[in-house]
A protein has these predicted regions:
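Terminal alpha-helical segments
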Residues: 1-120
Length: 120
């Protein structure tokens, strides 16, 4: 069985590429690594799996970490939502030029999420 860290490590490998297809894949993979890291932390804390009627499945997974409304939890949610937007751009807007700058933003947000999640 793989872990979120395995997905994260694969994304970091993709980040070394200058190929736009691999940069898009990196952006997507970093998002999913963080999403699974959130899920791992929430599961380890035995947080309930509830899905709000007005949220999609990814939004519900992201919001699950925000149980006490602490600043660190809010930051994780904020970064993860930024990552989701970047992932949607990379996956669906093929006319958009994706480059190393976009990859670096996604890496930065992922690292911040990872740091905060490791301290939950």
């Amino acid at each position: 069985m793989i872990k979120a860290s395995d997905i994260y490590n694969r994304a970091k490998q993709l980040a070394e590429s200058t190929n736009e297809t691999e940069q898009r894949e990196c952006i997507k993979t970093l998002y999913y690594a963080v999403l699974h890291k959130i899920q791992e932390v929430c599961d380890s804390k035995e947080l309930p799996r509830t899905r709000a009627a007005n949220l999609g499945s990814h939004e519900s997974m992201i919001e699950r970490i925000n149980v006490q409304n602490l600043p660190s939890e809010k930051q994780i949610v904020s970064y993860a939502k930024k990552m989701k937007k970047k992932r949607v751009d990379a996956d669906y807007i093929l006319s958009l030029n994706i480059n190393n700058k976009d990859v670096q933003y996604q890496i930065s947000w992922a690292e911040k999420c990872w740091y905060l999640l490791d301290r939950q």
